[in-house]
């Protein structure tokens, strides 16, 4: 999705949350998105959360409900909270629950209730499937893993391709390790290899920089490479249990 409208006063990117509602609420409060009572207060702000709100942590259903509430509240303050598709959302859509914690299941009530809630036509199944894979604001493209040159295209085209793949009517390879939900090379490969590929991808997308989650930064600090053309923002502040 491409952001339409005037440029907001603030653009904030947030990495992986992994069903850790307490850490998420503390972060939102710390950066001035919500007040002490948990109510949205930020005006004229766009927040892009780069995916992986599910799995690992204890607060699966509560996290989804809270984020949806904040999306609605943000709109009342001329703000926008964009949640992107992460590889863990994709896994849940496809029934891969390897990283679902027992407490996550309990948050839905039971295993069967979680399965029912995430069915393709159920409330949370529909919500997860509706998440965009990319968002572009001016010269910055946001995505969970990274967009390789092979899949580099305008934001709307990538979003459409991933949506079709989840429906089983498109190229399912886009959901694999080289696709935008899983790709890690820009933060892991030597810069001599990664940066030329990144430059090519950005040219095809029509952007100057890419902001990604997914690849953990154990230093707890945002990682910048390729002269500021890539930022890795998964600083592991949320649950990895």
Model-based region annotation:
Residues 1-241:
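Feature recognizes metal-dependent phosphohydrolase scaffolds
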């Amino acid at each position: 999705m491409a952001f339409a409208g005037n440029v907001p006063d603030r653009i904030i990117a947030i990495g992986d949350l992994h069903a850790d509602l307490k850490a998420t609420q503390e972060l939102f409060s710390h950066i001035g998105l919500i007040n002490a009572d948990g109510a949205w207060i930020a005006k004229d702000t766009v927040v892009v959360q780069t995916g992986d709100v599910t799995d690992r942590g204890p607060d699966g259903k509560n996290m989804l409900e809270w984020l949806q509430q904040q999306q609605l509240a943000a709109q009342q303050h001329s703000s926008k909270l964009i949640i992107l598709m992460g590889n863990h959302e994709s896994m849940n859509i496809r029934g891969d629950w390897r990283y679902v914690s027992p407490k996550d299941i309990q948050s839905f009530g039971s295993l069967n209730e979680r399965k029912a809630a995430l069915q393709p036509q159920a409330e949370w199944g529909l919500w997860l499937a509706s998440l965009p894979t990319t968002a572009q604001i001016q010269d910055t493209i946001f995505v969970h893993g990274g967009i390789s040159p092979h899949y580099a295209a305008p934001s709307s085209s990538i979003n459409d391709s991933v949506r079709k793949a989840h429906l089983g009517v498109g190229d399912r390879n886009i959901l694999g390790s080289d696709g935008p939900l899983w790709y890690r090379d820009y933060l892991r490969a030597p810069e001599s290899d990664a940066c030329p590929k990144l430059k090519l991808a950005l040219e095809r997308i029509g952007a100057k920089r890419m902001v990604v989650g997914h690849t953990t930064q154990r230093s707890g600090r945002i990682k910048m490479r390729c002269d500021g053309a890539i930022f890795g923002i998964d600083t592991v502040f949320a649950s990895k249990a």
